[in-house]
Amino acid sequence: MGRRYFGTDGIRGTVGEAPITPDFVLRLGYAAGKVLAGTADVAAGARPTVLIGKDTRVSGYMLEAALEAGFSAAGVDVMLAGPMPTPGVAYLTRALRLSAGVVISASHNPYQDNGIKFFSADGNKLPDETEAAIEAWLDKPLECASSDRLGKARRLEDAAGRYIEFCKSTFPAAYDLRGLKLVIDCAHGAAYQIAPHVFHELGADVIPIGVAPNGFNINDGVGATAPDALVRAVRANHADLGIALDGDADRLQVVDSTGRLYNGDELLYVLVKDRIATAGKVDGAVGTLMTNLAVEVALQREGVPFVRAAVGDRYVLEQLRERGWQLGAEGSGHILSLDRHSTGDGIVSALLVLAALKRSDRTLAQMLDGVTLFPQKLINVRMKPGADWKGSASIRAAIDAAEGALAGSGRVLIRASGTEPVLRVMVEAQQAADATRHAEAIADAVRIATS
Protein backbone atom coordinates (compact mmCIF):
# COMPACT_ATOMS: atom_id res chain seq x y z
CA MET A 1 0.00 0.00 0.00
CA GLY A 2 1.40 3.41 -1.01
CA ARG A 3 1.90 6.30 1.34
CA ARG A 4 -1.06 8.65 1.58
CA TYR A 5 0.60 11.78 2.92
CA PHE A 6 4.39 11.55 2.77
CA GLY A 7 5.99 12.49 -0.53
CA THR A 8 9.66 12.47 -1.47
CA ASP A 9 10.33 15.39 0.88
CA GLY A 10 7.83 15.07 3.72
CA ILE A 11 4.26 16.38 3.61
CA ARG A 12 3.57 19.57 1.68
CA GLY A 13 0.61 21.56 0.40
CA THR A 14 -1.39 24.77 0.50
CA VAL A 15 -2.03 26.06 4.01
CA GLY A 16 -5.64 25.60 5.05
CA GLU A 17 -6.20 22.77 2.59
CA ALA A 18 -5.75 19.12 3.51
CA PRO A 19 -3.35 17.98 4.74
CA ILE A 20 -1.75 21.29 5.82
CA THR A 21 -4.40 22.16 8.40
CA PRO A 22 -3.89 22.70 12.14
CA ASP A 23 -6.02 19.71 13.14
CA PHE A 24 -4.14 17.34 10.83
CA VAL A 25 -0.74 18.66 11.92
CA LEU A 26 -1.69 18.19 15.59
CA ARG A 27 -2.59 14.56 14.84
CA LEU A 28 0.64 14.22 12.85
CA GLY A 29 2.66 15.38 15.85
CA TYR A 30 0.80 12.91 18.06
CA ALA A 31 1.32 10.04 15.59
CA ALA A 32 5.02 10.80 15.21
CA GLY A 33 5.33 11.03 18.98
CA LYS A 34 3.72 7.63 19.49
CA VAL A 35 6.11 6.08 16.96
CA LEU A 36 9.06 7.65 18.78
CA ALA A 37 7.70 6.45 22.11
CA GLY A 38 7.99 2.89 20.85
CA THR A 39 11.73 3.04 20.25
CA ALA A 40 14.21 1.00 22.28
CA ASP A 41 15.69 4.06 24.01
CA VAL A 42 12.29 5.14 25.28
CA ALA A 43 11.45 1.62 26.38
CA ALA A 44 14.65 1.69 28.45
CA GLY A 45 13.34 4.70 30.35
CA ALA A 46 14.58 7.70 28.36
CA ARG A 47 12.03 10.39 27.53
CA PRO A 48 11.91 11.24 23.81
CA THR A 49 12.69 14.83 22.81
CA VAL A 50 12.21 16.37 19.37
CA LEU A 51 13.51 19.61 17.89
CA ILE A 52 11.17 21.80 15.81
CA GLY A 53 12.56 24.40 13.42
CA LYS A 54 10.75 26.45 10.81
CA ASP A 55 11.22 28.99 8.05
CA THR A 56 9.66 32.47 8.03
CA ARG A 57 6.17 31.81 6.62
CA VAL A 58 3.36 33.34 8.65
CA SER A 59 1.70 29.92 8.85
CA GLY A 60 4.73 28.58 10.72
CA TYR A 61 3.41 29.94 14.01
CA MET A 62 0.15 28.02 13.66
CA LEU A 63 1.74 24.78 12.52
CA GLU A 64 4.47 24.94 15.17
CA ALA A 65 1.83 25.26 17.90
CA ALA A 66 -0.15 22.35 16.46
CA LEU A 67 2.90 20.09 16.25
CA GLU A 68 3.96 21.03 19.77
CA ALA A 69 0.49 20.15 21.11
CA GLY A 70 0.49 16.80 19.32
CA PHE A 71 3.90 15.81 20.61
CA SER A 72 2.98 16.89 24.14
CA ALA A 73 -0.20 14.80 24.03
CA ALA A 74 1.95 11.80 23.07
CA GLY A 75 4.27 12.36 26.03
CA VAL A 76 7.16 13.76 23.99
CA ASP A 77 9.25 16.78 25.03
CA VAL A 78 9.81 19.55 22.48
CA MET A 79 12.66 21.98 21.84
CA LEU A 80 11.79 25.01 19.70
CA ALA A 81 14.60 26.37 17.52
CA GLY A 82 12.60 29.14 15.84
CA PRO A 83 13.67 30.11 12.30
CA MET A 84 16.31 27.56 11.35
CA PRO A 85 17.53 26.18 7.99
CA THR A 86 16.51 22.61 7.27
CA PRO A 87 20.14 21.37 7.44
CA GLY A 88 20.50 23.22 10.75
CA VAL A 89 17.69 21.14 12.24
CA ALA A 90 19.35 17.97 10.92
CA TYR A 91 22.68 18.97 12.50
CA LEU A 92 21.23 20.01 15.88
CA THR A 93 19.14 16.84 16.13
CA ARG A 94 22.28 14.75 15.76
CA ALA A 95 24.53 16.98 17.88
CA LEU A 96 22.10 17.17 20.81
CA ARG A 97 21.35 13.42 20.70
CA LEU A 98 17.63 14.06 20.24
CA SER A 99 15.03 11.51 19.16
CA ALA A 100 14.02 13.36 15.99
CA GLY A 101 13.97 16.73 14.25
CA VAL A 102 11.04 18.38 12.50
CA VAL A 103 11.13 21.18 9.93
CA ILE A 104 8.12 23.34 9.08
CA SER A 105 8.86 24.62 5.57
CA ALA A 106 7.85 24.39 1.94
CA SER A 107 11.40 25.13 0.78
CA HIS A 108 11.36 27.18 -2.45
CA ASN A 109 7.54 27.43 -2.68
CA PRO A 110 5.63 30.70 -2.09
CA TYR A 111 4.35 31.66 1.37
CA GLN A 112 0.87 30.22 0.75
CA ASP A 113 2.36 26.72 0.93
CA ASN A 114 3.95 24.95 3.85
CA GLY A 115 5.10 21.48 4.79
CA ILE A 116 6.41 19.17 7.48
CA LYS A 117 9.50 17.00 7.16
CA PHE A 118 11.22 14.82 9.71
CA PHE A 119 14.80 13.85 10.49
CA SER A 120 15.85 10.77 12.42
CA ALA A 121 18.17 10.90 15.44
CA ASP A 122 21.23 10.66 13.17
CA GLY A 123 20.19 13.66 11.07
CA ASN A 124 18.91 11.69 8.09
CA LYS A 125 15.49 11.74 6.48
CA LEU A 126 13.15 9.13 7.91
CA PRO A 127 13.19 5.66 6.35
CA ASP A 128 10.06 4.62 4.48
CA GLU A 129 9.01 2.17 7.18
CA THR A 130 9.01 4.90 9.84
CA GLU A 131 6.89 7.17 7.66
CA ALA A 132 4.51 4.26 7.10
CA ALA A 133 4.29 3.69 10.85
CA ILE A 134 3.41 7.35 11.41
CA GLU A 135 0.69 7.16 8.77
CA ALA A 136 -0.73 4.07 10.48
CA TRP A 137 -0.97 5.96 13.79
CA LEU A 138 -2.88 8.77 12.06
CA ASP A 139 -5.84 6.39 11.74
CA LYS A 140 -5.98 5.71 15.47
CA PRO A 141 -7.86 7.85 18.00
CA LEU A 142 -5.85 10.48 19.83
CA GLU A 143 -5.55 9.36 23.45
CA CYS A 144 -3.86 12.09 25.45
CA ALA A 145 -1.15 11.05 27.88
CA SER A 146 -1.94 11.42 31.57
CA SER A 147 -1.08 14.79 33.12
CA ASP A 148 2.09 13.46 34.74
CA ARG A 149 3.30 12.13 31.36
CA LEU A 150 2.54 15.14 29.12
CA GLY A 151 5.49 16.46 27.16
CA LYS A 152 7.08 19.79 28.02
CA ALA A 153 8.30 22.47 25.62
CA ARG A 154 11.19 24.92 25.82
CA ARG A 155 13.13 27.17 23.49
CA LEU A 156 16.66 26.27 22.42
CA GLU A 157 18.07 29.75 22.92
CA ASP A 158 21.50 29.13 21.36
CA ALA A 159 20.29 27.16 18.31
CA ALA A 160 21.51 29.74 15.77
CA GLY A 161 24.93 30.10 17.43
CA ARG A 162 25.48 26.34 17.54
CA TYR A 163 24.66 25.98 13.85
CA ILE A 164 26.80 28.98 12.85
CA GLU A 165 29.80 27.36 14.56
CA PHE A 166 29.11 24.06 12.81
CA CYS A 167 29.02 25.74 9.39
CA LYS A 168 32.29 27.56 10.09
CA SER A 169 33.91 24.28 11.18
CA THR A 170 33.49 22.88 7.65
CA PHE A 171 35.77 25.60 6.22
CA PRO A 172 39.51 24.75 6.35
CA ALA A 173 41.30 26.45 9.24
CA ALA A 174 44.24 27.35 7.00
CA TYR A 175 42.11 29.81 5.04
CA ASP A 176 39.75 32.71 5.65
CA LEU A 177 37.53 34.95 3.53
CA ARG A 178 39.33 38.23 4.17
CA GLY A 179 39.50 40.40 1.07
CA LEU A 180 36.35 38.91 -0.48
CA LYS A 181 33.20 40.94 -1.00
CA LEU A 182 30.20 38.59 -1.00
CA VAL A 183 26.51 39.22 -1.64
CA ILE A 184 24.44 36.76 0.41
CA ASP A 185 20.77 36.39 -0.62
CA CYS A 186 18.76 34.64 2.10
CA ALA A 187 15.40 34.66 0.24
CA HIS A 188 13.71 36.28 3.27
CA GLY A 189 13.87 32.73 4.59
CA ALA A 190 15.17 30.56 7.39
CA ALA A 191 18.83 31.58 7.03
CA TYR A 192 18.29 35.34 7.27
CA GLN A 193 19.81 35.59 10.77
CA ILE A 194 22.46 32.92 10.21
CA ALA A 195 24.09 32.95 6.77
CA PRO A 196 25.41 36.56 6.88
CA HIS A 197 27.07 35.85 10.24
CA VAL A 198 28.80 32.70 8.97
CA PHE A 199 30.53 34.47 6.08
CA HIS A 200 31.23 37.64 8.08
CA GLU A 201 32.85 35.72 10.94
CA LEU A 202 35.13 34.01 8.42
CA GLY A 203 36.35 37.43 7.31
CA ALA A 204 34.25 38.32 4.26
CA ASP A 205 32.81 41.76 3.53
CA VAL A 206 29.14 40.70 3.44
CA ILE A 207 26.34 42.50 1.64
CA PRO A 208 23.11 40.77 2.75
CA ILE A 209 19.88 40.86 0.74
CA GLY A 210 16.63 38.98 1.29
CA VAL A 211 17.01 39.40 5.06
CA ALA A 212 13.76 41.21 5.92
CA PRO A 213 11.09 38.50 6.23
CA ASN A 214 7.54 39.61 7.00
CA GLY A 215 5.81 36.24 6.82
CA PHE A 216 4.65 36.77 3.26
CA ASN A 217 7.76 37.50 1.16
CA ILE A 218 9.75 34.27 1.37
CA ASN A 219 11.21 33.40 -2.07
CA ASP A 220 9.38 36.41 -3.56
CA GLY A 221 11.70 37.71 -6.27
CA VAL A 222 14.78 36.71 -4.28
CA GLY A 223 16.73 33.58 -3.41
CA ALA A 224 18.01 30.60 -5.35
CA THR A 225 14.86 30.29 -7.47
CA ALA A 226 14.99 33.98 -8.52
CA PRO A 227 18.72 34.64 -9.04
CA ASP A 228 18.25 37.85 -11.05
CA ALA A 229 18.18 39.78 -7.76
CA LEU A 230 21.56 38.31 -6.86
CA VAL A 231 23.03 39.10 -10.28
CA ARG A 232 21.92 42.73 -9.99
CA ALA A 233 23.30 43.07 -6.45
CA VAL A 234 26.67 41.54 -7.38
CA ARG A 235 27.08 43.93 -10.29
CA ALA A 236 25.82 46.99 -8.39
CA ASN A 237 28.18 46.35 -5.46
CA HIS A 238 31.15 45.19 -7.57
CA ALA A 239 31.22 42.03 -5.45
CA ASP A 240 33.58 39.12 -6.01
CA LEU A 241 30.84 36.51 -5.68
CA GLY A 242 27.16 36.14 -4.88
CA ILE A 243 25.45 33.27 -3.07
CA ALA A 244 21.68 32.75 -3.14
CA LEU A 245 19.91 30.33 -0.80
CA ASP A 246 16.29 29.20 -1.00
CA GLY A 247 13.64 29.52 1.71
CA ASP A 248 14.96 26.70 3.89
CA ALA A 249 18.61 27.09 2.82
CA ASP A 250 19.20 23.55 1.60
CA ARG A 251 20.11 24.65 -1.93
CA LEU A 252 22.12 27.46 -3.51
CA GLN A 253 23.03 29.27 -6.69
CA VAL A 254 26.34 31.09 -7.19
CA VAL A 255 27.11 34.17 -9.30
CA ASP A 256 30.61 35.42 -10.12
CA SER A 257 31.79 39.03 -10.44
CA THR A 258 30.72 39.19 -14.10
CA GLY A 259 27.16 38.16 -13.29
CA ARG A 260 27.54 34.63 -14.65
CA LEU A 261 25.31 32.12 -12.87
CA TYR A 262 26.61 28.66 -11.91
CA ASN A 263 24.18 25.82 -11.27
CA GLY A 264 24.50 22.68 -9.19
CA ASP A 265 25.89 20.63 -12.08
CA GLU A 266 28.83 23.00 -12.52
CA LEU A 267 29.45 23.32 -8.78
CA LEU A 268 29.57 19.52 -8.49
CA TYR A 269 32.38 19.46 -11.05
CA VAL A 270 34.26 22.20 -9.14
CA LEU A 271 34.02 20.22 -5.90
CA VAL A 272 35.16 17.01 -7.58
CA LYS A 273 38.17 18.80 -9.06
CA ASP A 274 39.02 20.21 -5.63
CA ARG A 275 38.81 16.75 -4.03
CA ILE A 276 41.08 15.29 -6.69
CA ALA A 277 43.61 18.06 -6.01
CA THR A 278 43.51 17.54 -2.24
CA ALA A 279 42.85 13.79 -1.89
CA GLY A 280 44.31 12.43 -5.11
CA LYS A 281 41.11 10.80 -6.34
CA VAL A 282 37.32 10.72 -6.09
CA ASP A 283 35.64 7.32 -6.06
CA GLY A 284 32.56 8.60 -7.88
CA ALA A 285 29.86 11.27 -8.09
CA VAL A 286 26.08 11.17 -8.37
CA GLY A 287 23.82 13.47 -10.38
CA THR A 288 20.29 13.04 -11.68
CA LEU A 289 18.58 12.26 -14.95
CA MET A 290 18.63 16.02 -15.61
CA THR A 291 22.37 16.55 -15.00
CA ASN A 292 23.94 18.20 -18.04
CA LEU A 293 25.79 15.75 -20.27
CA ALA A 294 28.79 18.09 -20.48
CA VAL A 295 29.44 17.55 -16.77
CA GLU A 296 29.26 13.77 -17.15
CA VAL A 297 31.74 13.94 -20.05
CA ALA A 298 34.07 16.22 -18.05
CA LEU A 299 33.99 13.87 -15.05
CA GLN A 300 34.79 10.93 -17.32
CA ARG A 301 37.84 12.84 -18.57
CA GLU A 302 38.95 13.12 -14.94
CA GLY A 303 38.49 9.37 -14.47
CA VAL A 304 35.57 9.83 -12.06
CA PRO A 305 32.65 7.37 -12.34
CA PHE A 306 29.28 9.12 -12.63
CA VAL A 307 25.83 7.73 -11.83
CA ARG A 308 22.44 9.30 -12.55
CA ALA A 309 19.72 9.02 -9.90
CA ALA A 310 16.06 9.87 -10.26
CA VAL A 311 15.26 13.58 -9.89
CA GLY A 312 15.23 14.55 -6.20
CA ASP A 313 17.97 14.94 -3.59
CA ARG A 314 16.50 11.97 -1.69
CA TYR A 315 17.44 9.70 -4.60
CA VAL A 316 20.89 11.25 -5.00
CA LEU A 317 21.47 10.51 -1.32
CA GLU A 318 20.31 6.90 -1.75
CA GLN A 319 22.80 6.34 -4.58
CA LEU A 320 25.67 7.90 -2.62
CA ARG A 321 25.01 5.68 0.39
CA GLU A 322 24.62 2.58 -1.72
CA ARG A 323 28.05 3.15 -3.29
CA GLY A 324 29.86 4.68 -0.32
CA TRP A 325 30.58 7.89 -2.25
CA GLN A 326 30.62 11.45 -0.90
CA LEU A 327 29.67 13.97 -3.60
CA GLY A 328 26.38 14.42 -5.42
CA ALA A 329 24.21 17.25 -6.72
CA GLU A 330 21.15 18.38 -8.61
CA GLY A 331 21.24 21.18 -11.14
CA SER A 332 18.76 23.07 -8.96
CA GLY A 333 21.51 23.58 -6.39
CA HIS A 334 21.04 20.74 -3.91
CA ILE A 335 24.60 19.62 -3.19
CA LEU A 336 25.53 16.69 -0.98
CA SER A 337 28.93 16.23 0.62
CA LEU A 338 28.44 13.38 3.05
CA ASP A 339 31.79 13.82 4.76
CA ARG A 340 30.57 17.27 5.84
CA HIS A 341 26.85 16.81 6.52
CA SER A 342 24.12 14.17 6.35
CA THR A 343 21.89 16.30 4.11
CA GLY A 344 22.10 19.08 1.53
CA ASP A 345 23.21 22.39 3.08
CA GLY A 346 23.34 25.61 1.07
CA ILE A 347 25.68 27.43 3.47
CA VAL A 348 28.10 24.52 3.83
CA SER A 349 28.07 23.94 0.06
CA ALA A 350 28.94 27.59 -0.51
CA LEU A 351 31.85 27.28 1.92
CA LEU A 352 33.09 24.18 0.09
CA VAL A 353 33.07 26.11 -3.19
CA LEU A 354 34.87 29.06 -1.58
CA ALA A 355 37.47 26.70 -0.10
CA ALA A 356 38.06 25.21 -3.55
CA LEU A 357 38.63 28.68 -5.00
CA LYS A 358 41.00 29.60 -2.17
CA ARG A 359 43.04 26.40 -2.50
CA SER A 360 43.34 26.63 -6.27
CA ASP A 361 43.76 30.42 -6.41
CA ARG A 362 41.46 30.33 -9.43
CA THR A 363 38.05 31.73 -10.32
CA LEU A 364 34.98 29.60 -10.96
CA ALA A 365 35.25 30.31 -14.67
CA GLN A 366 38.87 29.15 -14.66
CA MET A 367 38.03 25.96 -12.76
CA LEU A 368 35.33 25.23 -15.33
CA ASP A 369 37.54 25.99 -18.32
CA GLY A 370 36.73 23.48 -21.03
CA VAL A 371 33.35 22.56 -19.52
CA THR A 372 30.61 24.16 -21.61
CA LEU A 373 27.10 23.06 -20.72
CA PHE A 374 25.18 21.50 -23.58
CA PRO A 375 22.04 23.42 -24.61
CA GLN A 376 18.85 21.77 -23.37
CA LYS A 377 15.38 22.12 -24.87
CA LEU A 378 12.46 21.21 -22.62
CA ILE A 379 8.90 21.00 -23.96
CA ASN A 380 5.90 20.15 -21.76
CA VAL A 381 3.24 18.36 -23.79
CA ARG A 382 -0.31 18.01 -22.44
CA MET A 383 -1.92 14.65 -23.07
CA LYS A 384 -5.11 12.82 -22.21
CA PRO A 385 -5.09 11.48 -18.64
CA GLY A 386 -4.05 7.84 -18.74
CA ALA A 387 -2.70 7.99 -22.30
CA ASP A 388 -0.36 5.06 -23.07
CA TRP A 389 2.60 7.05 -24.34
CA LYS A 390 5.06 4.31 -23.42
CA GLY A 391 3.38 1.87 -25.77
CA SER A 392 3.24 4.24 -28.75
CA ALA A 393 5.27 3.04 -31.74
CA SER A 394 5.31 6.53 -33.30
CA ILE A 395 6.73 8.13 -30.14
CA ARG A 396 9.34 5.37 -29.89
CA ALA A 397 10.29 5.95 -33.53
CA ALA A 398 10.72 9.70 -32.95
CA ILE A 399 12.92 9.04 -29.92
CA ASP A 400 15.01 6.48 -31.82
CA ALA A 401 15.46 8.92 -34.71
CA ALA A 402 16.67 11.67 -32.37
CA GLU A 403 19.03 9.36 -30.48
CA GLY A 404 20.42 8.03 -33.74
CA ALA A 405 21.08 11.52 -35.07
CA LEU A 406 22.73 12.64 -31.83
CA ALA A 407 24.91 9.50 -31.83
CA GLY A 408 26.38 9.93 -28.36
CA SER A 409 26.72 13.72 -28.58
CA GLY A 410 23.42 14.38 -26.83
CA ARG A 411 20.58 12.87 -24.81
CA VAL A 412 16.84 12.39 -24.96
CA LEU A 413 14.84 12.22 -21.74
CA ILE A 414 11.08 11.66 -21.62
CA ARG A 415 9.26 11.58 -18.29
CA ALA A 416 5.70 12.05 -17.13
CA SER A 417 4.78 14.71 -14.59
CA GLY A 418 3.78 13.32 -11.22
CA THR A 419 1.10 15.97 -10.65
CA GLU A 420 -0.61 16.64 -13.99
CA PRO A 421 -1.24 14.94 -17.37
CA VAL A 422 1.92 16.31 -18.94
CA LEU A 423 4.82 14.59 -20.67
CA ARG A 424 8.15 16.38 -20.33
CA VAL A 425 10.34 16.09 -23.44
CA MET A 426 13.97 17.12 -22.93
CA VAL A 427 16.68 16.96 -25.57
CA GLU A 428 20.29 17.91 -24.94
CA ALA A 429 22.77 18.46 -27.77
CA GLN A 430 26.03 20.22 -28.49
CA GLN A 431 24.17 22.68 -30.72
CA ALA A 432 21.03 24.50 -29.54
CA ALA A 433 19.40 24.17 -32.95
CA ASP A 434 19.75 20.38 -32.84
CA ALA A 435 18.25 20.20 -29.35
CA THR A 436 15.27 22.31 -30.42
CA ARG A 437 14.69 20.42 -33.66
CA HIS A 438 14.69 16.97 -32.09
CA ALA A 439 12.62 18.05 -29.07
CA GLU A 440 9.94 19.55 -31.32
CA ALA A 441 9.83 16.42 -33.48
CA ILE A 442 9.30 14.19 -30.44
CA ALA A 443 6.75 16.62 -28.97
CA ASP A 444 4.77 16.56 -32.23
CA ALA A 445 4.74 12.75 -32.13
CA VAL A 446 3.51 12.84 -28.53
CA ARG A 447 0.70 15.28 -29.37
CA ILE A 448 -0.53 13.12 -32.24
CA ALA A 449 -0.32 9.85 -30.30
CA THR A 450 -1.89 11.05 -27.05
CA SER A 451 -4.55 13.58 -28.10
From Swiss-Prot:
Its cofactor is Mg(2+). InterPro entries: A-D-PHexomutase_a/b/a-I (IPR005844), A-D-PHexomutase_a/b/a-I/II/III (IPR016055), A-D-PHexomutase_a/b/a-II (IPR005845), A-D-PHexomutase_a/b/a-III (IPR005846), A-D-PHexomutase_C (IPR005843), A-D-PHexomutase_C_sf (IPR036900), A-D-PHexomutase_CS (IPR016066), Alpha-D-phosphohexomutase_SF (IPR005841). One of its GO terms (cellular component) is cytosol. The modification Phosphoserine is found at residue 107. PROSITE patterns: PGM_PMM. Belongs to the phosphohexose mutase family. This is Phosphoglucosamine mutase. It comes from Burkholderia ambifaria (strain MC40-6).
